[in-house]
A protein has these predicted regions:
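Generic structural signal for well-ordered alpha-helical scaffold segments
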Residues: 79, 194-198, 297
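Class II aminoacyl-tRNA synthetase-like tRNA-binding/catalytic domains
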Residues: 2-162
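Hydrophobic faces of well-ordered beta-strands that scaffold small-molecule active sites
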Residues: 89, 144-148, 167, 208, ...
């Protein structure tokens, strides 16, 4: 196991046997038991002064600057436009340990890990993909899920809030051949986001990038690209995406003096691994409600 210079110093202090036990020898129940003892001991030692000091200084604990009364109407409009195909899901704030690493491609130090062997949700698309995979494995042919959830991340050296409200859609379906499933899912998601851009985010637009030439031709024939800016894949490779997308992806951009990206979406291979079925196709998409709200003010001015 590789670690940081700081963690290497700590491992040297506690010794090889403790390291081996914590990393490998203890089973999950034993490890949770030990960590629970650590948490109880540390919590008992805290004083009210410690609590308020941590609240003032720890960026992970700081409230967002967004007033909930400003987010509620935006979230309501996002829900009102969701197609009937989608089932609403209320996710836990926790997800399986390793979701950020194996689904989002994030390092474990960029998510909040709990002492109970779980992690705090960093992207609702991860939780929806896990739930969609569970439903697909129990016999559902096509699964379309929607949610909004407060997500927390541990970005270092950032002035932004460590948590945000995100609204997400996830679709999982079996491969129909000829990229027909991919085209169907893109139609479903992009129709929704086109409507949202027209009603919720007045100056918003969708930028679509397609890396598969066959799919690009199919989308053009179906009219999927209507009202959408299409970006050549080679011109978009240097811009980072929120998740490791394949085949096709899209961004939601608000025009202004400095264009602002408020969300994105694309095809992922998550459900293929989670369902152990290489024929599964999964499309995810979402926006940061925190990022969207200021642009709804601009539209009202």
């Amino acid at each position: 196991m590789s670690g940081t210079a700081a963690s290497t110093k700590v491992w040297r202090r506690i010794g090889v046997h403790a390291r081996e036990a914590l990393l490998r020898s203890l089973n999950p129940v034993e490890l949770r038991t030990i960590l629970a003892d650590v948490a109880r001991s540390r919590a008992a030692e805290q004083t009210p002064a410690d609590l308020i000091k941590r609240w003032r200084e720890d960026r992970l604990l700081m409230p967002s600057l967004l007033d909930p009364r400003e987010a509620l109407p935006v979230t309501a409009k996002l829900w009102a436009a969701v197609p009937q195909d989608f089932v609403g899901v209320t996710l836990s704030q926790l997800t399986s340990l390793g979701s950020g690493v194996h689904l989002g491609g994030r390092g474990q130090n960029r998510v909040i890990t709990t002492m109970r062997g779980t992690e705090v949700l960093a992207d609702p698309a991860h939780g929806l993909a896990l739930e969609a995979s569970r439903r697909r494995r129990t016999g559902h042919s096509r699964v379309h899920l929607a949610t909004h959830a407060r997500c927390t991340h541990a970005w270092d050296q950032s002035e932004e809030s460590s948590h945000e409200l995100r609204f997400s859609l996830v679709s999982s379906a079996p491969d129909g051949g000829g990229l027909s499933t991919e085209a169907d899912l893109l139609d479903l998601h992009l129709d929704y986001w086109r409507e949202v851009m027209g009603t919720v985010i007045p100056r918003g637009r969708v930028e679509l990038t397609v890396w598969d030439a066959t799919l690009a031709g199919l989308l053009e024939a179906r009219g999927t690209r209507d009202g959408i800016i299409v970006v050549e894949g080679s011109d978009d490779e240097r811009r980072p995406w929120r998740n490791p997308y394949t085949t096709a992806a899209f961004r939601f951009v608000v025009d202004g003096e400095e264009p602002a990206e408020v969300g994105d979406g694309g095809f992922v291979t998550w459900t293929q691994a989670l369902t152990r079925n290489r024929k599964d196709r999964c499309l995810v998409s979402g926006v940061s409600v925190d990022a969207v709200v200021p642009h709804t003010w601009e539209g009202a001015e």
